[in-house]
Amino acid sequence: MNHEAPLLEVGFLTFNKSTVMMLLVAAIIVFLIAFISTRSLKLKPTGMQNFMEWIMDFVKNIIKSNMDWKTGGRFHILGITLIMFIAVSNLLGLPFSIVYGHELWWKSPTADPTVTMTLATMILVLSHFYGVKMKGTGHYAGTFFKPMSFMFPLKLVEEFANTLTLGLRLYGNIYAGEILLGLLAGLASSGAVGFIGAIVPMMAWQGFSIFIGFIQAFIFTMLTMVYMAHKVSDDH
């Protein structure tokens, strides 16, 4: 499990080539799913179109559980993109991993904290952007001092804590799952006895990790809509 990350330095920036590649793979898979599902639309959906419409309704219900649809409808595409992209990203590293020259190339991109924290920061920025856009700068800034002005430092801590927990929750669950799968794979390759002892736990953990991957995508999307509602709804 002591694999190195393939790094690329561009000026003062350092990129993990594996993470960049896997993000592109996840984006391509999501694009293909969306393209195949919508290329021949029918009044009575079947197959992939039925699957895509189910996702759309599922995300719509998430939004409506947090804010009225008139306000939250603008976040529908964001929610669909998030839940599909994160679910695919969570599952990419489960079937196998690819190591070349002691460098790990194939993994779940969400097992990298820079990815999950970037997603969380993106949600933070978007929530503030829409808060200012829909409420106005003065009104929105005033919400940080309600109900009392001394709440302002606590509101700042809350913003930081929400972003941190949103990103690290996703990272921790996916990274821990891949670590345990790697340990079980190492046990299975140690010999016949190790293989027999590891095969059942590995299959069970694979199934559980798939479940966790979908659940974490749902949780991230749900919390995104909770944070958005908190910023843009008048009753928050």
Curated annotation (Swiss-Prot):
Gene Ontology BP terms: proton motive force-driven plasma membrane ATP synthesis
Localization per Swiss-Prot or TrEMBL: Cell membrane
PROSITE patterns: ATPASE_A
Cited PANTHER family: ATP SYNTHASE SUBUNIT A, CHLOROPLASTIC
Function: Key component of the proton channel; it plays a direct role in the translocation of protons across the membrane.
Annotated family: Belongs to the ATPase A chain family.
Protein name: ATP synthase subunit a
Organism: Lysinibacillus sphaericus (strain C3-41)
Gene: atpB
